[in-house]
A protein has these predicted regions:
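N-terminal capping/lid subdomain adjacent to the active-site entrance of alpha/beta enzymes
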Residues: 2-245, 250-252, 256-259, 263-266, ...
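Buried hydrophobic packing segments
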Residues: 116, 120-124, 334, 357-362
């Protein structure tokens, strides 16, 4: 019997408010794009799950083709069976022989599988009438463990060790949920320090971030060392010693250049240096981290799979792990790996829809995995939220726990129509 669901894919593009908002030292392409997937439950009118693959600029047509190929793997499955065992569904998506040779554990096909599983998670949470963070945090520990594929992780973390991590924090889950609902989750302001902002704008945005309750900000760096030192001096003078200042190099440097550049900036008491070099150079990250100690290195948004996260942690290459709005199952694996080594997780959220999704993962981590918000923050960029049905809410420098069912990935129908490529009405001149 055929599966009782249908699906639709769309390429979505947004122009940044300024052509340089969100641009980094390695790329001045700040436009956001997404390959967007909607899975509809044909048995229940209006029941939909939404997932996407985020990117900058174009190339969505290639990613959409990958999503179509992955959807073909499950087109003959019943929706109920897919949702009943999300661990097995994930393994089906990533292990199928049709795509096993296409960059296993990474690449376009793997990213596409992430969009598919996330759309299913969105639908599962909506069926349960729960926000995703609460659905995950309410699962028994053994069920959470079954969501993770430990084949390539067990040399660092076994299923039994993962279960022990979850069981250790289980007794106070309800207490932590009450605290989350009352206080929210720390947010880090990424908007003040865009690389191409004037000194005057940098100063003003730093003051506004502090007035809004943020205790951490981020500056982009890496284009010019003299400029970076001047901008950091301004930010530190404005913010004082009690505001954490992180910097993001956007993969700009080679290893030796990174060590020299970071050393030249270290006097400004850097909270971390993000993405200093190629995301696939794990040994390079380790070399940088060891050379610039005690300045922490943060990375992970470009990690192709939890296997890379495992290796970064084994190499002591990072002081902070940054996850992104990628496959829920793999993010759970990464959260468990980080908890097992005591490394804080600070999700990246610098694009359309990322805040809406990663907040659920961070809140699940606090309640059910690490049990801590200490030294943690979710990145916040004040752009694109108006395009989503349940936009992320940040007040007094903290994310407020979303209470609407789902993962937060669902876009407004009007925004989907206005920003669909190539039929755009609100985005002119972007190719």
């Amino acid at each position: 019997m055929g599966a009782a669901f249908s699906y639709l894919t769309s390429e979505i593009r947004f122009a940044s408010p300024s052509r340089l908002d969100g641009a980094g030292a390695a790329s001045r392409d700040a436009d956001c794009a997404a390959a967007y997937l909607t899975i509809s439950d044909d048995a229940i009118d209006g029941a939909e799950g939404h997932g996407f693959v985020f990117s900058a600029g174009g190339s969505g047509d290639v990613q959409l083709a990958a999503i179509e190929a992955v959807m073909a793997i499950i087109e003959d499955r019943r929706l109920d069976s897919l949702l009943a065992d999300m661990g097995e569904t994930w393994r089906t998506l990533v292990d199928h022989t049709r795509r096993g040779w296409l960059a296993p554990d990474g690449g376009l096909a793997h990213r596409a599988a992430g969009a598919v599983i996330n759309a299913l998670w969105d639908l599962k949470a909506k069926r349960a009438g729960l926000p995703l963070w609460r659905l995950l945090a309410g699962m028994p520990s053994a069920e959470i463990v079954r969501l993770v594929d430990f084949r390539y992780l067990s040399d660092a973390l076994s299923a039994e060790e993962a279960l022990a991590i979850l069981e250790a924090v289980l007794p106070h889950r309800a207490q932590r949920e009450r605290r989350l609902l009352a206080e929210g989750y720390p947010a880090a302001a990424a908007s003040p320090g865009e690389l191409w902002y004037s000194d005057e704008l940098l100063e003003r945005l730093c003051r506004e971030a502090m007035a809004d309750g943020f205790t951490q900000i981020k500056l982009k760096v890496g284009a010019n060392l003299v400029d970076d030192r001047r901008r950091l001096a301004i930010a530190r003078e404005v913010c004082g010693p009690d505001i954490a200042i992180a910097v993001d190099a956007d993969r700009r440097w080679g290893v030796d250049e990174a060590v020299g550049w970071i050393s030249a900036l270290s006097e400004f008491d850097l909270h971390w240096v993000e993405d200093p070099t190629s995301p696939v150079d794990l040994l390079g990250h380790a070399a940088i981290a060891h050379a610039v100690t005690p300045v922490p290195i943060a990375t992970g948004e470009h990690a192709l799979s939890p296997v890379m996260v495992k290796q970064l942690l084994q190499l002591n290459a990072i002081g902070y792990l940054q996850i992104d709005a990628t496959a829920v199952n793999e993010n759970i694996a990464s959260l468990l790996l980080a908890a097992g080594t005591g490394v804080p997780v600070c999700p990246r959220a610098g694009g359309a829809g990322l805040s809406e999704v990663v907040q659920h993962l961070a809140m699940f981590d606090y309640i059910a995995v690490s049990g801590s918000m200490e030294g943690r923050a979710i990145e916040h960029v004040d752009r694109y939220h108006e395009h989503f049905v349940t936009p992320a809410e940040v007040r007094d420098g903290r994310y407020r726990a979303p209470l609407f069912p789902g993962s937060g990935a669902e876009m407004l129908p009007t925004s989907l129509g206005d920003h669909m490529w190539p039929m755009l009405s609100a985005l002119d001149g972007v190719a």
